[in-house]
């Protein structure tokens, strides 16, 4: 399980720019307008052999500054409670503001490592101006420029030097771990209770009554798993109104330590933005995935087209990752709950699939010959053969060709789709690599 780092700060100090710099991506939208980060951005960072998870907490305003400040305070409080280390970003050009002081006051109360980061220090002349941030009472400011990258290497060095070794509480026995994930109050604990016939987890109508990730051994009907409840939220009064960010942080912890993820969504709401956020986290962690539409018993006036309509809506929202099993179930009535575990076992087995090299080439090379990679700037790419890598967590394949750099994402997606058509790879991501031969 990785350490989690949260970036917090008032609007327009460069949180998303720093997030993009550290993750070497353009995942977070960056704009001069305040509040452009409306969804919680999540990614992984690798530095000097250390991998950690990072979250851009964003921040946006609705109607008034007071509501905005309240929202920021909630997110900072959640970060304090759930993240391992906090990067508190301030703006050296505009200096200390009242909102900076409010956030600093919240951070000083907790026994959590806070690294004060003075952003927009694009030249040495601005370094001296960061001295005013000592008044925030959070130690030495690290001068960085997220826009050009200066100082970020030193920041990462200091960051990883303060990581604690994460100990996963998953039992050591080699049994697949299934994380049941989803936004608060979709029925995660109810599903585990229904499967085990035990009131192992506290269940109420209040979102977030599960207090910790709980590993429950399931050993029935020839199936053996550890079921992991992702804990909804563990709310303190001061953060009770903001469950989305909290539940996503908790989901990250369980997703990273699982083999298969069951993403529960609420049938009465279909698939929402928060469901897509968690879906994306599962994809980035390359976990097996099953989507379960819970509370199906609450849908009235169902007809033969109802399931098709729901399934089509889900696949449109999750595209291009559409090769995912979808099960319509009810933890309350126990309808199709055991099918969930049967499919989970199938997905787990698919992740272990080994396809002979001869079979791969016999099927794929004629397809490639019929639909070769596009000619790029007069360069003709010729794929010569393909083989599967061994000792990988998910099915991974290497295509040997003369010009690997000229094969772009759309053609890789074409190859993936062809592989999914010819081999049952439902529910698991696959890796496709190009190598020169």
From Swiss-Prot:
SUPFAM superfamilies: P-loop containing nucleoside triphosphate hydrolases (SSF52540). CDD domains: EngA1 (cd01894), EngA2 (cd01895). GTP 1 binds at residues 9-16, 56-60, 119-122. Residues 3-167, 176-352 form the EngA-type G domain. Gene3D superfamilies: 3.30.300.20, P-loop containing nucleotide triphosphate hydrolases. Residues 353-437 form the KH-like domain. Keywords: GTP-binding, Nucleotide-binding, Repeat, Ribosome biogenesis. One of its GO terms (biological process) is ribosome biogenesis. GTP 2 binds at residues 182-189, 229-233, 294-297. HAMAP family: GTPase_Der (MF_00195). Associates with the 50S ribosomal subunit. Belongs to the TRAFAC class TrmE-Era-EngA-EngB-Septin-like GTPase superfamily. EngA (Der) GTPase family. This is GTPase Der. It comes from Azobacteroides pseudotrichonymphae genomovar. CFP2.
């Amino acid at each position: 399980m990785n350490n989690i780092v949260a970036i917090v700060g008032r609007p327009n100090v460069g949180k998303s720019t720093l997030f993009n710099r550290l993750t070497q991506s353009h995942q977070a939208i960056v704009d001069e307008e305040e509040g452009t980060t409306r969804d919680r951005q999540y990614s992984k960072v690798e530095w000097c052999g250390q991998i950690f998870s990072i979250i851009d907490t964003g921040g946006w305003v609705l109607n008034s500054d007071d509501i905005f400040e309240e929202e920021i305070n909630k997110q900072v409080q959640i970060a304090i409670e759930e993240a391992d280390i906090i990067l508190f970003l301030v703006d050296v050009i505009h200096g200390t503001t009242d909102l900076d002081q409010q956030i600093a006051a919240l951070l000083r109360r907790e026994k959590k490592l806070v690294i004060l980061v003075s952003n927009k220090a694009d030249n040495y002349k601005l370094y001296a101006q960061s001295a005013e941030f000592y008044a925030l009472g959070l130690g030495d400011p690290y001068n960085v420029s997220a826009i050009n990258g200066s100082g970020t290497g030193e920041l990462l060095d200091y960051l990883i030097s303060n990581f604690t070794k994460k100990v996963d509480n998953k039992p050591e026995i080699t049994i697949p771990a299934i994380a049941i994930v989803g936004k608060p109050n979709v029925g995660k604990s109810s599903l585990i209770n229904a499967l085990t016939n035990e009131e192992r987890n506290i269940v109420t109508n209040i979102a977030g009554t599960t207090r910790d990730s709980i590993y429950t051994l399931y050993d029935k009907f020839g199936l053996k798993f550890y079921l992991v409840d992702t804990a909804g939220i563990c709310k303190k009064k001061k953060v009770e109104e903001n469950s989305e960010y909290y539940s996503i942080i908790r989901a990250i912890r369980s997703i990273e330590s699982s083999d298969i993820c069951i993403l529960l969504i609420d049938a009465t709401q279909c698939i929402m933005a928060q469901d897509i956020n968690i879906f994306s986290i599962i994809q980035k962690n390359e976990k097996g995935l099953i989507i379960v539409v819970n509370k199906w018993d609450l849908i009235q006036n169902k007809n033969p087209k109802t399931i098709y309509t729901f399934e089509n809506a889900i696949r449109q929202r999750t595209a291009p990752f559409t090769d995912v099993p979808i099960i319509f179930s009810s933890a309350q009535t126990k309808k199709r709950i055991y099918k969930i575990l049967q499919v989970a076992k199938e997905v787990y087995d698919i992740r272990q699939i080994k396809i002979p090299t001869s079979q791969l080439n016999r099927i794929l090379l004629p397809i490639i010959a019929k639909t070769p990679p596009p000619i790029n700037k007069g360069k003709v790419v010729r794929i010569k053969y393909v083989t599967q890598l061994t000792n990988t967590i998910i099915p991974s394949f290497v295509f040997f060709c003369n010009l690997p750099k000229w094969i772009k994402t759309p053609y890789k997606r074409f190859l993936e789709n062809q592989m999914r058509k010819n081999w049952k790879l439902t529910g698991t991501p696959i890796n496709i690599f190009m190598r020169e031969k």
